[in-house]
């Protein structure tokens, strides 16, 4: 509160020409007060009638010689100088490189800060100017609009980030579920395949056992039939060594359908002629 009061009071005793605390303040007939040096330099720069002067604030004409010292303002300025401003309140002062005066105006055409002497020079005469504070305030308002837009964009980006994080979490969980489902499905299929494999292997083992048993029986029968065949061959060879009378006598003694003939079975790989011959000899 006190800081705002001091600021307002300082504005009341600030020269409208140099925008600094007034030095040797003088007041015109219109009531506006200026630094004696600033208003004198301004009066000389505009090269007007030496008797008539136009106030740079309200543009009212008055006699330059009617300027009078303002002791009240001077006393206030002296008291303000006793108060040391805080670092936050202190601002760096920028002066005109050409005239050494404070840069308190802004030329809108040339887009540059100027002093009040620059405004009256040939370079900037007739250009639209405004106080730096006013232009700065305009820029601050524009920057505020930009800042609001940027903050809105920032909010959108934060929401976007949240959405991305939600999507990441969703897809991580979804893919994890899919991985579990795939593993479960393939395990089920492997269990089925393992069961089928066991069944098929059991069938093959049983088939092998049956085949081997059949082969064993065939081998046993083969051995028996081979023995009988060898016996028949031996008998035939023996009969061939006998005389005709003995051969006929042996034949008469053999009765068809004897046990030896019933026991012998022709093997499937013997030709029909051999089987016929063996049977004939056996029955002779």
Swiss-Prot record:
Tissues with expression: Expressed in embryonic CNS, liver, kidney, olfactory epithelium.
Keywords associated with the record: Coiled coil, Cytoplasm, Metal-binding, Zinc, Zinc-finger
Major location (coarse): cytoplasm
SUPFAM superfamilies the record matches: B-box zinc-binding domain (SSF57845), RING/U-box (SSF57850)
Residue ranges covered by zinc fingers (RING-type): 15-59
Zinc finger feature spans (B box-type): 91-132
Subcellular locations according to the entry: Cytoplasm
Pfam families the record matches: zf-B_box, zf-C3HC4_4
GO cellular component: cytoplasm
Molecular function as annotated in GO: zinc ion binding
InterPro entries: TRIM/RBCC, Znf_B-box, Znf_RING, Znf_RING/FYVE/PHD, Znf_RING_CS
Residue ranges that the Swiss-Prot or TrEMBL entry lists as coiled coil: 130-234
Residues that, per the record, bind Zn(2+): 96, 99, 118, 124
PANTHER family, sorted: E3 UBIQUITIN-PROTEIN LIGASE TRIM
Family stated for the protein in its record: Belongs to the TRIM/RBCC family.
Name this polypeptide is given: Tripartite motif-containing protein 12A
Organism: Mus musculus
């Amino acid at each position: 509160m006190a800081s705002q009061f001091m600021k307002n009071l300082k504005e009341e005793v600030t020269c409208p020409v140099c925008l600094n605390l007034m030095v040797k303040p003088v007041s015109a007939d219109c009531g506006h007060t200026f630094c004696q040096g600033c208003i004198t330099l301004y009066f000389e720069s505009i090269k007007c009638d030496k008797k008539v002067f136009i106030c740079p604030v309200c543009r009212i004409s008055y006699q330059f010689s009617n300027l009078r010292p303002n002791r009240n303002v001077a006393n206030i300025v002296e008291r303000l100088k006793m108060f040391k401003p805080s670092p936050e309140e202190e601002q760096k002062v920028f002066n005109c490189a050409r005239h050494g005066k404070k840069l308190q105006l802004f030329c809108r055409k040339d887009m540059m800060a100027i002093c009040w002497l620059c405004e009256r020079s040939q370079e900037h005469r007739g250009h639209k100017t405004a106080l730096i504070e006013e232009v700065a305030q305009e820029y601050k308002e524009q920057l505020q609009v930009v800042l609001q837009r940027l903050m809105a964009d920032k909010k959108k980006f934060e929401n976007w980030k949240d959405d991305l994080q939600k999507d990441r979490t969703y897809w991580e969980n979804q893919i994890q579920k899919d991985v579990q489902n795939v593993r479960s499905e393939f395990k089920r299929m492997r269990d089925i395949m393992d069961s089928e494999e066991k069944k098929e292997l059991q069938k093959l083992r049983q088939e092998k056992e049956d085949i081997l048993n059949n082969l064993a029986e065939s081998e046993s029968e083969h051995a028996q039939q081979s023995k009988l065949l060898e016996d028949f061959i031996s008998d035939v060879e023996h009969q061939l060594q006998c005389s005709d009378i003995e051969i006929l006598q042996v034949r008469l003694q053999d009765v068809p359908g004897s046990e030896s003939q019933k026991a012998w079975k022709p093997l499937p790989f013997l030709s029909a002629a051999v089987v016929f011959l063996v049977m004939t000899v056996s029955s002779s």
